[in-house]
A protein has these predicted regions:
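Conserved long hydrophobic alpha-helices within structured protein cores
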Residues: 6-12, 79
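A short, small-residue-rich loop immediately preceding and capping a beta-strand
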Residues: 2-4, 53-60
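Short, glycine/charge-rich flexible loops or terminal/linker lids adjacent to PRPP-binding catalytic cores
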Residues: 11-56, 66-70
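General beta-strand structural signal in soluble alpha/beta enzymes
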Residues: 1-2, 30, 114-117
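PRPP-dependent phosphoribosyltransferase catalytic core
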Residues: 73-124
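Acidic, glycine-rich active-site loops and adjacent beta-strand->loop/helix elements
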Residues: 7, 32-36, 89-92
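Short glycine-rich phosphate-binding loop at a beta-alpha junction
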Residues: 1-7, 86
Length: 124
């Protein structure tokens, strides 16, 4: 799993921790918004898997999908396969009559499946 810092950091860490407790280690990667200005100057931090590995991107709240797509692009550029984004809450901005929001449209255009645990209207 991977996520764009800072919002996804606790999600990535939580998935990694729970998977380790269940003896099914899932490594977590953090994708930076900008590369560090010192040290490795890397976009992606964490135990890097082999190129070609499938990675799911995690998001806390998704609105337009822009942050998630930025993370996906960096991961794909690094040689990983990303087909899915999982969000805790989908705000469903600019929702159409079919219940699809702006983020869902952006995900489809980037060949991504968007899965969310909650839609904002379910929480209000």
């Amino acid at each position: 799993v991977a996520g764009l810092t800072l919002g996804a950091d606790p999600l990535v860490a939580g998935v990694s921790l729970v998977s380790a407790l269940d003896s099914r280690m899932v490594n977590g990667l953090i994708v930076r918004k900008e590369p560090k200005g010192h040290g490795t100057q890397a976009w992606i931090e964490g135990p890097l898997p082999e190129k070609g590995t499938k990675i799911t991107v995690l998001e806390d709240v998704i609105t337009t999908g822009g942050s998630a797509i930025k993370a996906v692009e960096k991961l794909r550029d690094a040689g990983y396969i990303v087909n899915r984004v999982v969000a805790i809450v989908d705000r469903q901005d600019d929702c159409d009559s079919c219940g699809k929001g702006e983020a869902d449209t952006a995900m489809r255009e980037s060949d991504l499946e968007l899965c969310s645990i909650f839609k904002l209207n379910e929480l209000t």
